[in-house]
Structure formats: C-alpha cells, structure tokens
Regions:
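The feature captures the LRR N-terminal capping module
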Residues: 1-78, 83-86, 96, 109, ...
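A contiguous pocket-lining binding segment that forms or flanks enzyme active sites
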Residues: 125
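Extended, charged alpha-helical interaction scaffolds
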Residues: 98-105, 111-113, 117-122
Length: 179
C-alpha cells in the first residue's frame, strides 16, 4: 500500500512542480526547527511559500529571512510575533505576507522596503499608527488588511486620499477583536 500524503502536502503538490512549499502550520513550534535548514540547504532558493501559521512563534531569526530569500508568500498568522528582523528586507521577491492574529504594536516598517510586496495582512494585532506615506510609495502594493487594530483617527483621515490600494479598516467603533 502506498504512503498517503497529508492534505497540506497534496494541496501544495497540486500547485505545480515549479512552486516549492513548506507547510509547518499547527505544529506548536516555538522557533523554526534548526534541522530544517540542514534538510533543505540545497533547495532553499526553490522554496517560494512557507506556512508557519497557528504555532507559538515569538520571533523569527535573521537566518530564516536570509536563508529563504526567494520566498514569494509567507504565512505567519496566529502566532505571538511582535516584530520582524531587519533582514526581512532581503525578501525582495515576497508578494504576500500574512501576520494576522499576532501581537504587533508597531507596524513592521521593514515591509515598506519590499518592491514586489502586493498584499499585507495585519488583521487582529494592536497597531495604532501606520506609515501611510511609505505605504503609498510602495510600487506593487494592492491590499493591506488592518481590520481589528486600534488605529488612531489620524490614520483614518490621512490614508484615503494618499493611497491607491485597498486598505481594509474596521469602523471606528469596532476596535475589539471579532467574536
């Protein structure tokens, strides 16, 4: 009898042989496993999507960012992250990042330096202020989700006339997390 692949592996395989993915979601990880660096050392430049969603990560190392510098999608939702290492700026091919349901109090401004970034999801964090001018200058940005963050009134007033992308925000009175 052949070995059955888990659904996550099957979904990834269906995306095509040219797109390499690594799914480590819901594994109760508190850090990125060092052994993974060794196992993947010859193919890191071919990995375009990593999912570390719904773990217990409190931080990511600079080594993670520099090792997987060819990433196009990074899913980190549902962790305990409060910042990103400066080396996130090495992810020059990154198109989408999901940082929803983490513990960011400050907008991770390093993301504004990524030329290919199209989608940022920061829903359900504790972000008050957003660098609207820097976001407006991002050439590829199409969407940023800031729903369920306690955004200050200034962001709500300044952002709309400056931006040319979709900026999702909760109504002013809906600052609490969703039910």
């Amino acid at each position: 009898m052949g070995r059955r692949r888990r659904p996550r592996e099957r979904d990834c395989a269906a995306q095509g042989a040219r797109r390499h993915c690594r799914h480590l979601a819901e594994c109760k990880l508190v850090s990125f496993p060092i052994g993974i660096y060794k196992v993947l050392r010859n193919v890191t430049d071919q990995i375009h999507l990593i999912t570390l969603a719904n773990n217990e990560l409190k931080s990511l190392t600079s080594k993670f960012m520099t090792t997987f510098c060819q990433l196009q999608e990074l899913h980190l939702e549902g962790n305990f992250l409060h910042s990103l290492p400066n080396e996130v700026s090495t992810l020059q091919h990154l198109k989408a990042i999901d940082l929803s349901r983490n513990q960011f109090h400050d907008f991770p401004e390093q993301l504004t330096t990524l030329p290919a970034l199209e989608t940022i999801n920061l829903e359900e964090n504790e972000i008050v202020d957003v660098p609207v001018e820097k976001l407006a200058a991002m050439p590829a940005l199409r969407s940023i989700n800031l729903r369920f963050n306690p955004l200050n009134a200034e962001v709500r007033v300044i952002a709309p006339p400056l931006i040319k992308f979709d900026m999702l925000m909760s109504p002013e009175d809906a600052r609490a997390s969703p039910p």
